[in-house]
């Protein structure tokens, strides 16, 4: 089993990844500044939890030297698109400079054998078909721009140091313990608060939603392959759902109808109508298959105890 360090391991996707790896017997440590994450979500004891900010280069290096990981999975980032658009300097500082510090620390600690860097489908341009990893990039928001820079940094680092590097382009994650008000947790919050008239933004965009448990399994499967060089993979489910489809899934699990009212304040000025992953490369490389569908995921979310 590997010694693993997850940056952002107390966040939404990072905590699911940590739980998955810990259950598989990997030796886990977490670095997180808890600006969005929550300490209780990180499945590690206090001596393996490091309260640190990736913008602090020396702090990152201290943690890396203390933990001597085999694998580093870099998930720490600001990723809520409206927040990034409103705070572009902060987004760039964390997502770009923070990544530089993590990569530099990996290069200075000889134990590190593989690096996984979380990116996003937001690096792609607006298109109407499924996208594979060979498609040209063309982000249309601050988040995507910072993550494309992250990818370039990771690739340059891998070429310069010879470090095996995996770049994972995450599509739309859903699951328990969400820490940002994306679509599914926002519907969940309103429904659990007793609302049957939902206030949402644009109803027509379609997204490829993938459960965080499936994402965690995909990341582990990629690292277990022992990939050499620098490789990029889409991490999605390969099925797209509209906002209306998501609301319908909640209706099925509730057994009652929901009404939707469009809130103009929630409508994005620049909106992708489609975002769908071609995950052929991921499946071909690892044999991975997603296990969670929308209905199963929504059923568990309705049983979740969330702050309203």
Predicted regions and their residues:
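Residues that form or immediately flank small-molecule/cofactor binding pockets and catalytic motifs
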Residues: 54, 136, 175, 205, ...
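Generic structural signal for helix capping and beta-alpha/helix-loop junctions
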Residues: 38, 81, 125, 175, ...
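Residues in well-ordered alpha-helical elements
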Residues: 58, 70, 82, 89, ...
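C-terminal substrate-binding subdomain of Rossmann-fold SDR/epimerase-dehydratase oxidoreductases
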Residues: 192-308
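N-terminal Rossmann-like NAD(P)+-binding domain of SDR-like oxidoreductases, especially those catalyzing
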Residues: 1-173
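A structural alpha-helix within SAM-dependent methyltransferase catalytic domains
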Residues: 22, 64, 103-107, 155, ...
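NAD(P)-dependent short-chain dehydrogenase/reductase
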Residues: 129-130, 142, 148, 152-208, ...
